[in-house]
Amino acid sequence: MTKNSIAVTMRYDYFYNGKEVRNGIDFNLINWVYNLGYTPHLVPNDIRYFKIIKKNKFAGFILSGGNDINIKTTRVLLENKILKLSIKDKTPVLGICHGMQIMNRFEDGNLTRVSNHVQKYHKLCDNEFEYPNKVNSFHKYGIKRLGKNFEVIAYSNDNQIEAIKHRKHNWLGWMWHPERDKIFNKKLIKIAKNFFKKKKI
């Protein structure tokens, strides 16, 4: 089963003034993974669940968006373990927004606060690949120092880093949310399909 599945991490959703904390994921991200031809396997924010992840061979991982990075949260600890596992098993990892930030930080990069990048659309510039002309933006932090062995493959028109890939590992990072487009972008679907098939993109 898992060879046709992609494991997807989830965000924290807080209710009742923080007294109740839930695992959360956008239904559209689930649909987006199905559009890639895979079954999404949702990963709860529980470090004990990593034992299950290690026992299975997924086609890939998606570190999803949502939540600013707090290095002490179980989510971040779990996502770091997933990145380490992906290096060992050579499993593709796609980082979406928060997920791309986690990848960058894992390789000693850091972030800086940015303005005008929440609920906006930005043009992409200096694209290495056939990305769309415009992408959505829902983040308060951008990359200040690029992590080791990463290269930038797309900038926004205001010179913010929007997409990165790793030179050694099969890691790809997007600062935008492909699942939040009203109609899923066909170019992104094609890029992601090839990526999880471990083809060169």
Predicted region positions:
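A generic "binding-loop/recognition-motif" signal
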Residues: 99, 139
